[in-house]
Curated annotation (Swiss-Prot):
It is found in: Cytoplasm. It comes from Thermococcus sibiricus (strain DSM 12597 / MM 739). Part of the RNA polymerase complex. NCBIfam families: PRK09570.1. Gene3D superfamilies: RPB5-like RNA polymerase subunit. This is DNA-directed RNA polymerase subunit Rpo5. It comes from the Archaea. It is an enzyme of class 2 (transferase). It holds the Pfam family RNA_pol_Rpb5_C. Signal peptide: none annotated. Its main location: cytoplasm. It catalyses: RNA(n) + a ribonucleoside 5'-triphosphate = RNA(n+1) + diphosphate. Belongs to the archaeal Rpo5/eukaryotic RPB5 RNA polymerase subunit family.
Length: 82
């Protein structure tokens, strides 16, 4: 008998890597860019990536994107309620 492999949204080639920042990383990010959490782009709790990470409103998500010109760059979003 073969076991079925459980796939996640992150297994798809077009979905970039996501992760929830720790409290310390969040503080460093906000201090580095001299911003408030409300100044970050938003991502809703209904987003499949947010649900897969079990992120809560107020968490900051780091998205690692690949670019043919910039190489790898990071994008940050704050989780908000729908």
């Amino acid at each position: 008998m073969t076991a079925k492999k459980s796939l996640t949204i992150f297994d798809h080639v077009l979905v970039p890597e996501h992760r929830v920042l720790s409290k310390e990383e969040t503080e460093e990010l906000l201090k580095k860019y001299n911003i408030k959490p409300s100044q970050l782009p938003q991502i809703k709790t209904s987003d499949p990536a947010v649900q897969a990470l079990d992120a809560k409103p107020g968490d900051i998500i780091e998205i690692k994107r690949k670019s043919p010109t910039a190489g790898v760059y990071y994008y940050y979003r704050i989780v908000v309620e729908d």
